[in-house]
Amino acid sequence: MKVRASVRKICDNCRLIRRRGKVMVVCSNPKHKQCQG
């Protein structure tokens, strides 16, 4: 999980979602997981 100021899609499988008020990226590739911190 990468914590970043700006999250963005890295590949086509990445999806932007909101969880508990945080913007997150979930993907089939675990390296692409990000959350906004």
Curated annotation (Swiss-Prot):
<dbReference type="GO" id="GO:0005840">
    <property type="term" value="C:ribosome"/>
</dbReference>
<dbReference type="GO" id="GO:0006412">
    <property type="term" value="P:translation"/>
</dbReference>
<keyword id="KW-0689">Ribosomal protein</keyword>
<dbReference type="GO" id="GO:0009507">
    <property type="term" value="C:chloroplast"/>
</dbReference>
<dbReference type="GO" id="GO:1990904">
    <property type="term" value="C:ribonucleoprotein complex"/>
</dbReference>
<protein>
    <recommendedName>
        <fullName>Large ribosomal subunit protein bL36c</fullName>
    </recommendedName>
</protein>
<dbReference type="Pfam" id="PF00444">
    <property type="entry name" value="Ribosomal_L36"/>
</dbReference>
<dbReference type="InterPro" id="IPR035977">
    <property type="entry name" value="Ribosomal_bL36_sp"/>
</dbReference>
<dbReference type="InterPro" id="IPR000473">
    <property type="entry name" value="Ribosomal_bL36"/>
</dbReference>
<keyword id="KW-0687">Ribonucleoprotein</keyword>
<comment type="similarity">
    <text>Belongs to the bacterial ribosomal protein bL36 family.</text>
</comment>
<keyword id="KW-0150">Chloroplast</keyword>
<keyword id="KW-0934">Plastid</keyword>
<dbReference type="GO" id="GO:0003735">
    <property type="term" value="F:structural constituent of ribosome"/>
</dbReference>
